[in-house]
Amino acid sequence: MKIYVISLERAVERRSRVESVLAARGIDFEFFNAVNGFEGLPERLQALPDDQHRIRFRSRPLTPGEKGCYASHFLLWEKCVELNEPILILEDDFLPTQYFEEVLGTLPKVHEQYEYVKVEPQIGSASALTTIDNMQLMFWHNNSCWTTGYSISPQGARRLLAHSKRWVCSVDNFIGESYRTGLICTGLIPYAIYSPRDMGSDIQNQVELKKVPLGFKLTRELYRCYRFIRMTLWNMKHCGGKS
């Protein structure tokens, strides 16, 4: 399985660490130059972020960094479809666990049935689906945090692309909103990677967020309730991992 590591070209320290830890284990990979949202999106993607929806229902538009992060994953979903084979997508702030190679060898078997497999720790509740190669395959009830590591099949990538005509949330929230995409979010335990989060945010960076008007706070909370209900209904229907 091809491994792509999303990384800004200028992220010398991060790239050096990735090269060091993966080379030491004889693992082939390829850096994928991340889109720097602070320098603008590729022209064909510029109209996709829906700032008005974001402001109305989530209080603020996507930050330039969030747009760049979404664009980077979007382009790799296109690459997955082009290759017509599952790929492993990693962000450059990860470290491999002792189980990395085992998980990597198991992923093709998981993709015989499932389109998306998270390979990093995830918070929240989950349901056990099955055991593959002595690993536990989980169905995550809430997969709205982090995109440091996951594998995606061409069909799964097509789902994400088909529902990315408008970018209405950050990419990790989008992937986690299974009711929107129809993507069943599974994950393997033990995990292949973890993020020490010791280098701060690079692709996204931090920007000063403006104070949210009271009216938008109300619509934000109403929308949050809507999402909770939709995800609850989705989980009730799909907790067995079946589409």
Show where each model-derived region lies.
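An acidic/histidine-cluster motif and surrounding catalytic segment
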Residues: M1-L90, F94-S243
